[in-house]
A protein has these predicted regions:
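Acidic, proline/glycine-enriched N-terminal capping motif
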Residues: 1-131
Length: 131
């Protein structure tokens, strides 16, 4: 099975890495700041509309192209500034797991990730079961 779509949106620049920690009764408590919760909810709302009827099974190849509003950059120019691709992917895979694209993001055995400046911002996603 192959799932392929484009989500027109301003991609979140806050990432999974930005979780916060506080200490309560001598124990660390991790929490998501409001900005991260908002980004996660926005992504969840977009992805829930596109989830498959049945979760992908077995090994999955995930391709994601992140298109950020170009500003003064050229359309299609690679984005070489933060956020890092691995942090973007962690949030994306967590949300894709939560809405039911697969059972566990450990199933993602192959990843292709790119980030660009673009005239039309959004996220291109292609997920496919590998034989």
């Amino acid at each position: 099975m192959v799932i392929e779509f484009f989500v027109p949106m301003n991609p979140p620049t806050v990432t999974h890495q930005e979780k916060q920690v506080r200490v309560k009764n001598g124990k660390p408590i991790f929490y998501e700041p409001a900005e991260l919760k908002t980004a996660r909810a926005k992504l969840r709302d977009h992805l829930a509309k596109r989830r498959p009827e049945q979760p992908l099974t077995g090994a999955v190849r995930l391709a994601a192209k992140w298109y950020f509003p170009r500003g003064r950059h050229r359309d299609g120019e690679y984005r070489i500034t933060k956020p890092d691709t691995d942090n973007l992917q962690k949030l994306l895979k967590d949300v894709m797991t939560a809405v039911g694209f697969w059972q566990d993001d450990a199933q993602v055995a192959s990843e292709i990730v790119e980030k660009f400046w673009a005239e039309i911002p959004g996220i291109y996603i292609r997920a496919e079961e590998m034989a």
